[in-house]
């Protein structure tokens, strides 16, 4: 199934081609542009048009790449152990799955929106390179490797607040100035 835009989203031929190439070639798509030009809406409409679940990861200045994988709550586990809680025996009870974990373990291919990736610190994109390339990561606490059942269609957005690292950009299929390409 090809993306051609929707009744709620008029896509240019170039942008539709970029979305379809990202899907076919299984490469992340980066859409850059000014706030309010429809970058996030693109991911929503792509998911709707392709009948795929949308998983949204909204990035803030304090977001760490590891949060997209998982977070281990050692403090709660320590407290539970002091209170004699039976849950403490299974460390998995203290793992909060991140958006990449959810996307990788979904039973069907999903659209993963990594929204405003340029808001995070400069190392954030590079910290995701291996996971996005291999489509797997290791959870040290449980000793398991989380592998993607289906490679998600990854759409990243950037407001051009700061430059993204060259090593990261070289792994992307396409970048676009959304202000020129998007019509909403």
Task: Enumerate the language-model features and the residues they cover.
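AAA+ P-loop NTPase catalytic core and its hallmark functional loops
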Residues: 1-176
């Amino acid at each position: 199934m090809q993306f051609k835009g929707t009744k709620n989203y008029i896509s240019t031929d170039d942008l539709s081609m970029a979305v379809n190439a990202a899907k076919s070639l299984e490469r992340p798509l980066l859409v850059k542009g000014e706030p309010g030009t429809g970058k996030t809406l693109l991911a929503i409409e792509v998911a709707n048009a392709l009948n795929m679940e949308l998983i949204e990861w909204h990035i803030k200045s304090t977001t760490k790449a590891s949060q997209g994988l998982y977070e281990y709550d050692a403090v709660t586990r320590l407290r539970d152990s002091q209170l004699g809680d039976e849950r403490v025996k299974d460390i998995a009870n203290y793992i909060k799955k991140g958006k990449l974990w959810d996307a990788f373990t979904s039973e069907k291919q999903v659209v993963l929106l990594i929204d405003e990736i340029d808001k995070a610190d400069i190392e954030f994109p590079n910290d995701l390179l291996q996971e996005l390339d291999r489509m797997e990561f290791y959870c040290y606490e449980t000793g398991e490797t989380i592998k993607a059942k289906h490679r998600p269609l990854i759409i990243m957005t950037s407001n051009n607040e700061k430059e993204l690292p060259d090593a990261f950009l070289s792994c992307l299929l396409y970048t676009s100035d959304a202000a020129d390409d998007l019509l909403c």
